[in-house]
Amino acid sequence: MVQKPLIKQGYSLAEEIANSVSHGIGLVFGIVGLVLLLVQAVDLNASATAITSYSLYGGSMILLFLASTLYHAIPHQRAKMWLKKFDHCAIYLLIAGTYTPFLLVGLDSPLARGLMIVIWSLALLGILFKLTIAHRFKILSLVTYLAMGWLSLVVIYEMAVKLAAGSVTLLAVGGVVYSLGVIFYVCKRIPYNHAIWHGFVLGGSVCHFLAIYLYIGQA
């Protein structure tokens, strides 16, 4: 049986092109960002923990943008079904991956390491949830993404004391940008709402990358 192509799944063809191109740009950004972080780490003789943290962060960013680009670019229904799961699982990995340099390199305290365990545990549970029963509780996924992101408030005092003001500012701005983007994610009636959401994701990712590259990586 020939698989029917799926050009539209709630989005027009033009919207899907915008969706895939927007995160295709993010994919290039993620690759360049990871290279810059690793080159800087080697130049500064960074610890193995720091290099591992940057690798996890950069790898998770690349994975997220790759998954999203493929999901929106490939038009076949069966592939789309699995790529959608891949895309949503990658969000959990990006959240945990972004935390990693801040907690293990920037703070490196018992509280930060404890939060690190919690965040990665939640990410793995989230992936399991996505692969099994997430279709029954769609709104819960969005709530868990936001909740995981703002768990950083647990270490807000340590960040204010130990991290550069620029780093904390960029981290906070990135979180706000991600959160504001959710408005467009849920407003399906807005033309190109998903591409706009992707723009906010890119903006948040750039803020967090700059916080890590300009401050955490040079501390």
Swiss-Prot record:
One Pfam family in the UniProt entry: HlyIII
GO CC aspect terms: plasma membrane
Record's bilayer topology term: Multi-pass membrane protein
Record's keyword annotation contains Transmembrane helix: yes
Keywords annotated in UniProt: Cell inner membrane, Cell membrane, Membrane, Transmembrane, Transmembrane helix
GO BP of this protein: regulation of membrane potential
Ranges in the topological domain labelled Cytoplasmic: 1-23, 75-90, 135-138, 187-195
Subcellular location: Cell inner membrane
Membrane topology, Periplasmic segments: 45-53, 112-113, 160-165, 217-219
TM segment ranges: 24-44, 54-74, 91-111, 114-134, 139-159, 166-186, 196-216
Molecular-function GO term, any one: pore-forming activity
Similarity comment text for this entry: Belongs to the UPF0073 (Hly-III) family.
Protein name: UPF0073 inner membrane protein YqfA
Organism: Escherichia coli (strain K12)
Lineage: Bacteria, Pseudomonadati, Pseudomonadota, Gammaproteobacteria, Enterobacterales
